[in-house]
A protein has these predicted regions:
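Conserved short beta-strand elements that form part of the metal-binding/catalytic scaffold
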Residues: 41
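Charged, amphipathic alpha-helical segments and their flanking helix caps
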Residues: 1-33, 44-140
Length: 140
């Protein structure tokens, strides 16, 4: 049986796969960026939990990251904005991931344009997604 953390991350990845962009999990950046864009979910770190006793529970604010990349000769800013908005809509649709989390929220992206020699430039950002959830133990 998978841990709470793995179940939540797999569900988040499945949610991102419904978008037009290619959604990967903990993969290396591919050589080619799909026309619709690319999202790579990085599992991130659960951090130090707050612990409550009776019953014993571990409350995490897990910080996962989404690496978001679009590549286009023209309209790169619009394509990037469209992809960011689609991610926001997907997260807003169910902020508990079907009851697995207490709450999920994304932080604002800080984007950067990256020139590519001999190809269209990239626009990329890392979006931190904070997953608030509770487990019965650090390894549960």
């Amino acid at each position: 049986m998978p841990t709470t953390r793995e179940t939540i991350l797999a569900t988040l990845h499945a949610r991102l796969q419904t978008l037009a962009a290619l959604a990967l999990r903990d993969e290396v950046l591919p050589e080619r960026i799909p026309a619709a864009g690319l999202i790579i979910l990085r599992d991130g770190q659960p951090g130090e939990p707050e612990v409550t006793l009776s019953p014993l529970r571990y409350h995490y604010q897990h910080r996962a990251e989404l690496e978001v990349v679009v590549q286009a000769a023209t309209g790169r800013a619009t394509a990037f904005d469209t992809l960011i908005a689609a991610i926001g809509t997907a997260l807003d649709a169910d902020r508990t991931l079907g009851g697995l989390c207490d709450w999920i929220e994304a932080e604002a992206p800080a984007s950067v344009d990256l020139p590519v020699e001999g190809a269209a430039a990239l626009k990329a950002a890392v979006i931190t997604v904070i997953l608030h959830y509770t487990t019965t133990g650090p390894l549960a």
